[in-house]
């Protein structure tokens, strides 16, 4: 249920960002997070993952979205910790590609592609949770 909710919330954020555009400050922060994620280990990756998804919602300018995310963060973070522990190099690379794809698609105003990357991301998360 939480994964499904997060998927819908983030797709809504993508739709808003496609209309409004990604603000310059948030672009820089996205790029910093993504660059740091490339060399992250399993101890630092969960926090960076949370930072990325929080930034996605924060960039919309909709404080209620961030508040809702914070409310479910503890439950979801436990799942992400499990996923990260189960993640091999291939899955880590795929997750990184999906994060980068979400941001790049939004920066280029390609809404459909951003939504596909969100779906791909959560499909992989759900697959990893089933293992």
Regions flagged by a language model, labelled:
Residues 17-31, 35-37, 41-45:
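Exposed, interaction-prone assembly regions rather than primary DNA-binding/catalytic cores
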Residues 1, 25-32, 64, 101:
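Exposed alpha-helical structural elements
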Residues 24-28, 43, 47, 63-67, ...:
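Short, solvent-exposed positions on alpha-helices
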Residues 1, 5-22, 50-89:
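Hydrophobic, amphipathic alpha-helical faces that serve as interaction scaffolds
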Residues 31-34, 38-39, 47, 51-53, ...:
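C-terminal all-alpha effector/ligand-binding and dimerization domain
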């Amino acid at each position: 249920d939480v994964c499904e909710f997060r998927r819908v919330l983030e797709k809504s954020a993508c739709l808003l960002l496609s209309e409004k555009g990604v603000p310059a400050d948030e672009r820089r922060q996205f790029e910093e997070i993504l660059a740091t994620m490339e060399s992250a280990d399993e101890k630092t990756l969960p926090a960076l993952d949370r930072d990325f998804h929080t930034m996605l919602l924060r960039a919309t300018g909709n404080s209620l979205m961030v508040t809702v995310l914070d409310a479910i963060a503890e439950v979801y973070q436990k799942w992400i910790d499990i996923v990260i522990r189960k993640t091999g190099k291939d899955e880590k690379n795929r997750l990184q590609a999906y994060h980068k794809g979400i941001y790049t698609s939004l920066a280029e105003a390609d809404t459909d592609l951003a939504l596909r990357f969100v779906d791909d991301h959560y499909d992989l998360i759900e697959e990893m949770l089933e293992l």
